[in-house]
Amino acid sequence: VSADRTDDDRAGSPLDSALTTLLDRLRRRPDIETAELRAWDAADRYLLDTAAAAIARAGGEVVVIGDTHGALTLGALVLGATHVRVHTDSLVAERALLANAAETGQSEFSLHALDEVMTPETRLVLLRLPRALDQLDALAREVARAGHGEVVVIAGNMLKHMTPTQNDVLRESFEQVDVSLARSKARLLTARRPRAVTARPASETRVDEFDVTIVAQPGVFAGATLDIGTRALLEVSDQWPTYDRAIDLGCGSGVLATQLARRTPAAHVVASDVSAVAVASAALTARANGVEVEAVRDIGLSTQEDGTADLIVLNPPFHVGAAVHSGVAERLFVDAGRVLRPGGQLWTVWNSHLAYTPALERAVGPTRQVSRTPKFTVTVSRKA
């Protein structure tokens, strides 16, 4: 499959107009929507423009990995793909794709786990380059391992999120990696000639200080390390109240969920995250430490019933994609306030400069500081 294509080949064509119309209709929901954040960027458009000829010649089916809100999947359909197999780690991204597909009347795609998205017939993959190198390695290995022997990967992102090391990672799974010129502050990498590789395994680290083993699938936040926000919550875990049902919200690798389960073995502990690799990692971490945890992929606490938790622990993200934004954390505070029982507690760690206390008091209830460093603050909020 050739991936060579220039802007001039497509400018003013009916397909170009149809693609522009599609992209203009896309929204981010249920992701954060603001005037500054939109559902596609120049990297998506560059990737689609470049891949147009390859899509038309790919035999009908294309694989898309890492689509953020549906631009690549729905764009590939506009450009002639008869079916798109999609893998994305984020449940928010999946829901945004489904919402945009319903809005635009497109349905010829299917959602898959990473180890199921490729087929031996897959010849073309459109990949939104992740910033995490271990995640990129896992994705590249899966494509090279499970795709057609002549599979081509066209990968892209904005320049500010790219490094030369990404080229090196791709070269570990593909013999040829070509680098495009920059366009609108975006760049593409095209990988061909897959090597004989195996799937990347999870990583594992023992943290003796807290007597915990961390197991992490590629791409989970902080990997198999103890991030300093989680450490701050562990350091005050002896002050957590008693609980019959507790939730690690935004669980990442599940260290806090494991601590909750070890501290009160009879409790029902839920580890919840929007990320598929986080949920898988939390389950593996719990198993490695001999405890039982219910690992759930969810947007916030949307599947949890009102007033059912005694304790929620939270180390919230402060980015929406690459942009610093408080919107995700504030949504999680609201969810926690809804799911906590009267008298239940939310223990939160946050970057001190973000000053979340007013938002916590609005969403949950009276909030007091438990500990503070120049970088992190731990608070406890009590549901009235």
Stretches with model-predicted labels:
Residues 143, 260, 332, 336, ...:
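Class I S-adenosylmethionine-dependent transferase superfamily signal
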Residues 32, 37-41, 46-54, 182-245:
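SAM-dependent Rossmann-like transferase core, predominantly class I methyltransferases
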Residues 2-4, 9-66, 72:
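Extended, compositionally biased accessory segments flanking or bridging domains
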Residues 147-148, 340-342:
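Helix-to-beta-strand junctions that scaffold the AdoMet/dcAdoMet cofactor pocket
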Residues 40-109, 228-314:
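Conserved SAM/SAH cofactor-binding pocket of Class I
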Residues 124-133, 249-256, 309-323, 336:
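Conserved proline-anchored active-site loop of SAM-dependent methyltransferases
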Residues 174-209, 220, 351-384:
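Class I S-adenosyl-L-methionine
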Residues 127-209:
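N-terminal auxiliary segments of SAM/dcSAM-dependent transferases
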